[in-house]
Amino acid sequence: MRAVEKAHFLETARHAVLKAVEFVAQSTKERPPRVDRHDLLGKEVKLDIDQRLSELLTYQLNETGIAVISEESPASHTIVDEVVWLIDPLDGSYNFLRSAGPSAVCVALLEGLSIQCGVVYDLQSNRLYSGGRGIGALCDGVPIAVSTQSRIESALVYTGVPSRMDMTNPQSLGRITNLLKHAQKIRMIGSAAVSLVNVASGIGDVYLEEAIMPWDVAAGIAVVEGAGGLVHAQLTSRSQPIRVVAGSHELVELLSAE
């Protein structure tokens, strides 16, 4: 996809995300998230607002004529169109419910299995991130760049333990143990998208997570790539969990080799 096309779609995504953010602001004013009805599916939390944001974003993005795959719409997970929007209407739902940390509205554009561009709105900091490979990355209109940190011993690493992670898998657990042993600092903040944009901004140095869903990370990956970062993510499906390593080139190469 050409840079000019990416820029056009990125503006469309920004517009849709800002409409969703307006809805969040109005909804939380009328009905605080602590009293929202929610469903617990295993370790997953689903709020009313997840579904309502999904419907709003889908309506906005459908105007482009491009199909939308949403985390909150299982029927959309089998869409096979070459170009699709991939959205997580509210990444970090549990944080949102409990006011426990960051959450985000996320929209990405995919061509096949290639992430073209994405937008992440951090609802806690009220910052809008956007970007994609070859078109740069911005935070509230200001260019951002990943860090140049090359030593894991000096690195701030973002990670998480998603609900789909196999806690009996010694390889996955071993990677987390190695991070705890060698990284200078580890942060688990409950939102993959915000973790990724923090890495894109140079706040953190690298992000690593096992068994994370593509809609949780696609928009954030686009921003990291736009910010000059390296991403290793074996995306084989738009709706199956993947392992992601993203950030400074040296650290991604190091952690991907494990």
Q: Model-predicted segments: where are they?
A:
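Conserved beta-strand termini and adjacent loop/short-helix elements that scaffold enzyme active sites
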Residues: 71, 189-191, 234
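Glycine-rich active-site/cofactor-binding loop and its immediate structural neighborhood
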Residues: 81-125
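Acidic beta-strand-loop-alpha-helix segment within the catalytic core
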Residues: 108-195, 243-258
